[in-house]
A protein has these predicted regions:
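FIC/Doc superfamily catalytic core
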Residues: 1-215
Length: 215
């Protein structure tokens, strides 16, 4: 996927509408944020990307989330060839959550730091805050030492979400890492569509017994 990565970077420099970079930015931001509860339409997401304005009613928080997601995609393109590390994931989180109402109103949601309070995903118990650094480092070490085939990338995503290292933003970071690792390892990258989120969450919940829901 080296050619695709370079094409994304080339098209970003050109700043033209309608190319694959433009299309991926809009579709990835729309779907990943919508899975997490954003009310923006895909057209509104497109308007924000193209003009930094939006027609119709839109929550300020949703606009900020979309804008930050565009920046996160660019940060991912800049680091796509780098190995995973806790520091890289923390930097992604800082980009995603920078300037949000949530981060401004409660230090628990500060950007670029691991969670301070327990959280959950789909009713599943996640890693305790004090255990996050060690478990995440171990997960990354195992992953980086493997073949990093498609199945390994999906397995990493599942185990990252089970750790749920951040107070908020884990799903969006996890899905961006999925995209990054596909680009890095010669796998065609893909977007998890919002209209399939029921199957996506089922896949996360049942992965140990039925990995096929994610694969």
């Amino acid at each position: 996927m080296a050619d695709l990565l370079e094409e994304y970077r080339r098209q970003r420099r050109l700043k033209l509408e309608g190319n694959i970079y433009h299309k991926t930015q809009v579709e990835l931001a729309y779907n990943s944020n919508h899975i997490e509860g954003s009310r923006l339409t895909e057209e509104q997401t497109r308007q924000i990307f193209e003009t930094r304005t939006v027609d119709g009613h839109a929550r300020l928080a949703d606009i900020q989330d979309a804008t930050n997601h565009f920046r996160l995609f660019d940060a991912m393109l800049d680091t796509a060839e780098e190995p995973l590390s806790p520091e890289l994931l923390l930097s992604f989180h800082e980009v995603l959550k920078q300037g949000t109402e949530q981060a401004a109103s409660d230090p628990i949601f500060a950007p670029g730091v691991f969670k301070a309070l327990p959280n959950e995903v789909g009713g599943l118990v996640t890693t305790l805050p004090e255990e996050v650094p060690g478990q995440l480092a171990s997960l990354i070490e195992r992953y980086e030492g493997g073949s990093r085939a498609f199945e390994d990338i999906v397995d990493f995503h599942y185990r990252f979400e089970r750790i749920h290292p951040f107070q908020d933003g884990n799903g969006r970071i996890g899905r961006m890492v999925l995209f990054k690792e596909c680009l890095r390892n010669g796998v065609l990258p893909f977007i998890v569509p919002d209209d399939k989120k029921r199957f996506y969450y089922r896949g996360l919940a049942n992965y140990e017994d039925e990995p096929g829901w994610l694969l």
